[in-house]
Amino acid sequence: MAFEKLGEKFSNFFAMDNEDDYQDQEDEQAQQPAPEQPVDNHYRSNKVVSMATPAGKTAKIVVYEPRVYSDAKEIGSHLLNNRAVVINFDRIGSDDATRIVDFLTGTVFAINGEIKRVGESIFLVTPANFEIDGSLASTIDSDGLNLSSQH
């Protein structure tokens, strides 16, 4: 008799014949509404940058004299923050100056900006919200970037 009760307990414990209990639990879960989570409709992307200057805010132009190639990253950061940069390459070698101009050419392409040579070793680099007007053809050599007079 004791073994029968023990066997009955094991069979009740491991048996799947109590499906009604299982369905009741499932029904209770289905009837409970899912907790509401606030919907965030804000677009989260760091790739989208507003290029418009807010009303009343002064646009900035940064003057920069790079001394090493790694300065190109800082100049690029100014462009991404909607600041125009005037770059004087007098204090850097022509190879590094050429590399910086190449880097900045790619940067201004990506942000729809412009890069213009305004002097023998001076460039103006602007983001999309600036407009460069005029020409300095008399100061620009026909062979493009000529920084051979550099150190």
From Swiss-Prot:
The record's section on InterPro entries has: Cell_div_SepF, Cell_div_SepF/SepF-rel, SepF-like_sf
Give GO cellular component annotations, separated by semicolons. Answer: cytoplasm
Task: Give the UniProt subcellular location, in the record's own words.
Answer: Cytoplasm
Q: Which UniProt keywords apply?
A: Cell cycle, Cell division, Cytoplasm, Septation
| Segments for region (Disordered) | 17-42
Q: Where does this protein have compositionally biased stretches of type Acidic residues?
A: 17-29
Which Pfam families did the record assign? SepF (PF04472)
Q: Does the keyword Kinase apply?
A: no
Q: Which GO terms describe its biological process?
A: division septum assembly; FtsZ-dependent cytokinesis
Question: Mind telling me which HAMAP family this protein's record contains?
Answer: SepF
- Function, as annotated: Cell division protein that is part of the divisome complex and is recruited early to the Z-ring. Probably stimulates Z-ring formation, perhaps through the cross-linking of FtsZ protofilaments. Its function overlaps with FtsA.
Q: Tell me which family the UniProt entry assigns to this protein.
A: Belongs to the SepF family.
Q: How does it assemble?
A: Homodimer. Interacts with FtsZ.
The record's section on PANTHER family has:
CELL DIVISION PROTEIN SEPF
Which protein are we looking at? Cell division protein SepF
Q: What is the lineage of its organism?
A: Bacteria, Bacillati, Bacillota, Bacilli, Lactobacillales
User: What gene is this protein a product of?
Assistant: sepF
